[in-house]
């Protein structure tokens, strides 16, 4: 689904690390690691999949509103997921603003994306136009 880091607490990170590396003393290492890590990975998956599914649905609604059809939708869906991953990884603030500005410039120059639609996608993901100034 989505690549990139997702925010995890120290206890989640330690739990996964502990489950992985205590298993190396067992001869069936791969099986043991997967068995021990599965509940933690499933929890992370269940936490983050709804976020990115919601992003896809929201971006799709914006694209329908602007009349974007066919393969062009993939450009804006990809942009939306990149913005959502950046928000998930680094949170709101100046770093996110810089990241979004760079992504927008890249998508405009590389893919010929419409800046107005990119702004609409950004605003729907960040929750408010006040969170991003184009």
Curated annotation (Swiss-Prot):
Homodimer. It comes from Saccharolobus solfataricus rod-shaped virus 1. The keyword DNA-binding applies. InterPro entries: Sulfobus_virus_coat_C. Keywords: DNA-binding, Virion. One of its GO terms (cellular component) is helical viral capsid. Self-assembles to form a helical, filamentous nucleocapsid. The capsid proteins wrap around the DNA and maintain it in an A-form by non-specific desolvation and specific coordination of the DNA phosphate groups by positively charged residues. This certainly protects the viral DNA under conditions such as the extreme desiccation of its host. Its main location: virion. The keyword DNA-binding applies. The N-terminus projects into a DNA groove. This is Major capsid protein. GO terms for molecular function: DNA binding. It is found in: Virion. It comes from the Viruses.
